[in-house]
């Protein structure tokens, strides 16, 4: 499968979803320019996700990517939150700003409730971070005809993702910004640079590999393509 079959785009470029700092506007611009625009949904409630998808579909007929987290939520720890607020208080005071720290997690893992909200859109492409949703939920998403990819930060994670039936693997090198998509290990010593990771993964999996991390110009894109991504 080549990139056009996987992405449905003019160029082999996926815009990295940046939760908390971008809206649908960037996704629309990238899709219109010939790449695959991405909407980060990990910090949005279902109402906001629906509104953003409707904005995208009302602005472009090009393919787009919905990105979701698949992490396990930790129990809310009030004592830990108090420590954080007290630690940060001097900085808020220095900036003459109100303390506005939300209670509970602002990062919501993919769920059947979210699937209920987006199913009517039959999204063409969904990417996951921190592994994959459980098997019945993944099967549900794939039943829509949606292409599914997820991030791997090690060769072992890439092999596991392929065994679960993903259509592509995002090889997230150590240079990548934002959340590290580690899910089979939490040891930072296992993390590889992009060139090393892509070189290993393309030799061991049969699905398309998408390179991610520190790619900032056409030379970087060409280098990743030459590696087999």
Predicted regions and their residues:
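Active-site/ligand-binding-proximal alpha/beta "capping" segment
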Residues: 190-226
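Active-site entrance/lid segments in N-terminal catalytic domains of soluble metabolic enzymes
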Residues: 1-204
């Amino acid at each position: 499968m080549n990139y056009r079959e996987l992405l449905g785009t003019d160029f082999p470029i996926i815009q990295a979803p940046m939760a908390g700092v971008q809206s649908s506007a960037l996704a629309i611009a990238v899709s219109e320019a010939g790449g695959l625009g991405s909407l980060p949904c990990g910090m949005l409630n279902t109402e906001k996700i629906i509104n953003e998808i409707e904005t995208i579909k009302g602005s472009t007929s090009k393919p787009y990517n919905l990105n979701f987290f698949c992490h396990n939520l930790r129990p809310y720890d009030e004592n830990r939150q108090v420590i954080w607020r007290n630690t940060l208080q001097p900085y808020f005071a220095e900036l003459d700003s109100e303390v506005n720290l939300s209670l509970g997690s602002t990062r919501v893992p993919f769920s059947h409730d979210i699937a209920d909200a987006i199913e009517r859109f039959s999204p063409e492409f969904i990417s996951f971070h921190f592994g994959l949703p459980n098997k019945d939920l993944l099967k549900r998403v794939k039943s829509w005809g949606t292409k599914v990819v997820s991030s791997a930060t090690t060769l072992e994670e890439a092999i596991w993702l392929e065994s679960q039936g993903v259509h592509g693997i995002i090889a997230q090198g150590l240079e990548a910004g934002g959340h590290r998509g580690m899910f089979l290990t939490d040891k930072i010593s296992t993390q590889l640079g992009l060139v090393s990771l892509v070189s290993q993964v393309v030799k061991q999996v049969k699905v398309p590999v998408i390179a991610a991390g520190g790619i900032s110009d056409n030379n970087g894109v060409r280098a990743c393509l030459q590696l087999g991504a």
